[in-house]
Amino acid sequence: MSMQDKVLILHGWGGSDAPHWQAELAAAIAKDYGTVSFPLLDNCHFPSKNRWVKQLKEILEDFKPDTIVCHSLATTLWFWLCNEPTMKEIPQIKRLFMVSPPSITTEVDTIKTFFPCELPENLYAKEVQMIVSDNDPYIQVKEAESMAKKFDIPLTVIKNAGHINADSGYGKWELIEDLVMEKR
């Protein structure tokens, strides 16, 4: 990551405040004099797909990130945006990290406006990496493998990491910091 690169960190349902790894990543980038945006998306505990898509479009237009790091529902949000005809007007980003994407057929009432979600044809990123856990309650490894195959992207499967969030012990997470900050 060069000093000029801008990193946008997008949380999932409920946010990703400290001690979540996304909050730690934002702090690590800032401590290294990097440029980071870690916005709180509208009504994160009761999200609306349409409101989040609109907000993300505004963020992309204003911030113009080089790298985007999505956790959970933020990955689904990215899929929805990539399926929009107006996405072609937004410049392709350099890197996209998708951590713990939920199944595209997730059935949870509070986030039902996001599902089912069709996988986009294009992720609008030059490099994409997906990281999941083998015991994530929101996606099976088989579906993650299918997604990775469709997009022809690398998939990292971590053992017993749950939903890769603070509840499963992922506060400071060196792997994602190293990948995003290009130390690996």
Language-model segments: residues:
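Active-site catalytic motif of lipid deacylating hydrolases and related acyltransferases
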Residues: M3-K64
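Gly/Ala-rich beta-loop-alpha elbow adjacent to hydrolase catalytic centers
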Residues: I68-F79
